[in-house]
Amino acid sequence: MRKLKITELNRISAEEFKQVEKLPLVVVLDDIRSLHNIGSVFRTSDAFRIECIYLCGITATPPHPEMHKTALGAEFTVDWKYVNNAVDAVDNLKNEGYIVYSVAQAEGSIMLDELQLDKTKKYAIVMGNEVKGVQQEVINHSDGCIEIPQYGTKHSLNVSVTTGIVIWDLFKKLH
């Protein structure tokens, strides 16, 4: 076995990326404070051809040098928009036909491994602040909550790690 060189990875160009079909998934970042987490979400979203990222509240917007350290240019390939209020973002997405799930530990949440999706539908996931999580009002406007099963002593994962796990799972279910 031999590690591949970067030139052997057959990656598409940024121009080609803009034209290819995207996964019918929007990521909503609700008050994410860490530029590194935001950049990491951009990079993961690029890897799985996510349709768009909504940056809400205090979530910073590109371009930013600290964000670029983890995004590595994905902040220029993945479509994004800033929406001041995450509730407005959720309501707008629902009006556009998206099914919106907040990723939160909540009463009645669906475990990610039990979530069933319809490949003919469009979805959005809301990721919450690193300390407070998704705002309750945003949860109230969502179609439901999904949760990653955890078996250790901690009750949460880093938001960029959580986003990566959820995107990967939804990608497998929708692709």
Predicted regions and their residues:
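Post-transcriptional modification and biogenesis factors for structured RNAs
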Residues: 1-175
